[in-house]
């Protein structure tokens, strides 16, 4: 059930009848795909992101980090290399707000680009660097007719409105997400189990998938059948 809040849900009291699901079509298991990702910038969340990505991609995937890393960061990446199995991690040193540097990366060769905030900088300075990077990326996209998905981390929620101009696909404001999560848990602590399930790589998630993966196209099926076929994968 999708609702604005938990107190706006009204059950109709109906418990059926339910039809017996029938298998239709040839169910197609979705395989993980080789992905080539680029991380621009760095902070303590970078290692967690690499480990999480490793759970979703196929062997042979790559992840390139371009950032100014400390010796401690480099040591962490070496440890992560030994812990992951699907991603080959490489590091390049460069300035993420310099357009020539970004052009030299051939960013069009990457399927995903993640822009991380430098948290050792002042909040506004870090977000300014991120916004400049985004503007350069979108300019490169238009100038060289390239297409790539960009996920951007920002430190100040107010700067998100400025980032819309740069047309990033998704924004993540970490502190704001934590605040929203804590407010939800304060109202209902049992939601923690739900979030734990959603945040696990093996847990339940929402994806857009072609209907042909679950049913034969052009044939009428009921909702229970779709659910049964999806659960069979």
Per-range role (PLM):
Residues 1-233:
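Cytosolic regulatory regions of ion transport systems
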């Amino acid at each position: 059930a999708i609702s604005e809040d938990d107190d706006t849900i009204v059950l109709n009291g109906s418990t059926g009848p339910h039809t017996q699901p029938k298998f239709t079509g040839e169910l197609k298991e979705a395989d993980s795909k080789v992905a080539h990702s680029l991380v621009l910038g760095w902070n303590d969340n970078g290692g967690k992101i690499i480990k999480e990505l490793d759970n979703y991609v196929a062997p042979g995937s790559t992840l390139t980090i371009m950032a100014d890393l400390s010796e401690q960061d480099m040591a962490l990446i070496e440890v992560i290399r030994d812990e992951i199995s699907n991603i080959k991690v490489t590091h390049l040193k460069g300035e993420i707000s310099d357009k020539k540097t970004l052009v030299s990366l051939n960013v069009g060769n990457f399927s995903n680009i993640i822009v991380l905030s430098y948290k050792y900088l002042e909040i506004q300075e870090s977000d300014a660097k991120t916004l400049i990077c985004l503007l350069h990326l979108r300019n490169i996209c238009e100038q060289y007719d390239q297409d790539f998905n960009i996920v951007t981390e920002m430190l100040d929620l107010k700067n998100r409105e400025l980032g819309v101009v740069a047309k990033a696909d998704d924004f993540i404001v970490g502190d704001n997400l934590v605040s929203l999560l804590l407010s939800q848990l304060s109202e209902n602590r049992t939601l923690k189990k739900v979030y734990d399930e959603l945040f696990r790589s093996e847990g339940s998630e929402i994806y857009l998938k072609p209907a042909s993966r679950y049913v034969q196209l052009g044939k009428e099926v009921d909702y229970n059948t779709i659910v049964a076929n999806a659960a069979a994968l």
